[in-house]
């Protein structure tokens, strides 16, 4: 007959095994435009994560980091609307107008059910 100690250890190990996915942080899976891409004038930016997000606690900042003739010109892009896609895993940044030629950095933060905030950034260029 299994001992109480052995059963306890097995229960803890099984709990840890099955609880791990629930405690995982969301990971950025893909972006449009892709990181380091050079694209035509986008009218929206999307970020897809590995888990459903808490929309009120997740968001982005879009900065123009350079433009033709002014490589170190930093200017915030304003007036965009952020929403969550039907899958709950995609942040959609609807820009008020297509982005102009230059380089851009998107800084994001995301929170899922585990309530831990993760953050990161990626850059792309507009031709």
Task: Briefly describe each language-model feature range.
Residues 44-52:
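Short edge beta-strand/loop segments characteristic of extracellular beta-sandwich folds
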Residues 11, 23-25, 60, 65:
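Intrinsically disordered, low-complexity terminal tails and linkers in eukaryotic proteins, enriched
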Residues 23-42:
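N-terminal edge beta-strand
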Residues 19-21:
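N-terminal signal peptide c-region/cleavage motif recognized by signal peptidases
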Residues 37-40, 54-125:
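Acidic, low-complexity Ser/Thr/Gly/Pro-rich repeat segments typical of extracellular/periplasmic
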């Amino acid at each position: 007959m299994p001992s109480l100690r052995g059963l306890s250890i097995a229960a803890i190990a099984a709990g840890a095994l099955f609880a791990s996915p629930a405690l995982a942080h969301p990971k950025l899976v893909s972006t449009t435009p892709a990181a380091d891409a050079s694209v035509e004038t986008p009218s929206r930016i999307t970020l897809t994560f590995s888990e459903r997000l808490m929309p009120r606690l997740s968001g982005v900042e879009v900065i123009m980091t350079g433009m033709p003739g002014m490589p170190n010109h930093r200017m915030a892009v304003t007036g965009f609307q952020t929403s969550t896609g039907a899958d709950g895993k995609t942040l959609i940044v609807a820009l008020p107008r297509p982005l102009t030629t230059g380089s851009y950095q998107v800084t994001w933060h995301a929170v899922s059910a585990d309530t831990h905030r993760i953050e990161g950034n990626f850059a792309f260029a507009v031709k």
